[in-house]
């Protein structure tokens, strides 16, 4: 499954444990292309920073969906789909 949208914010240089090993990631929020009022919170794994500026389109491959029980917030663990040069 892919998520495409406009990058609203990003927080680079973070670290997490994912599937038993440490990974760098970028926390970001994207606005859905079809419905810009819908925002998605994503962790883009294995990236120190994104080569996409805030306000530009981005496409991510979702590898895991996580729902935080207490808050009910859904977060997507993703990988960046790189554009061919």
Where are these regions (language model features)?
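A structural detector for beta-sheet-dominated domains
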Residues: 31, 45, 61-63, 81
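Short beta-strand micro-motifs in enzyme catalytic cores
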Residues: 24-29, 72-76
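Beta-strand/loop nucleic-acid-binding surfaces
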Residues: 29-52
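Structural detector for short beta-strands of small beta-barrel domains
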Residues: 1-22
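OB-fold and OB-like beta-barrel modules that bind single-stranded nucleic acids
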Residues: 5-9, 55-65
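Broad gene-expression machinery/nucleic-acid interaction feature
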Residues: 2, 25-27, 57
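Well-ordered beta-strand positions in beta-sheet-rich domains
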Residues: 2-4, 39-41, 77
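OB-fold/S1-family single-stranded nucleic acid-binding modules
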Residues: 63-85
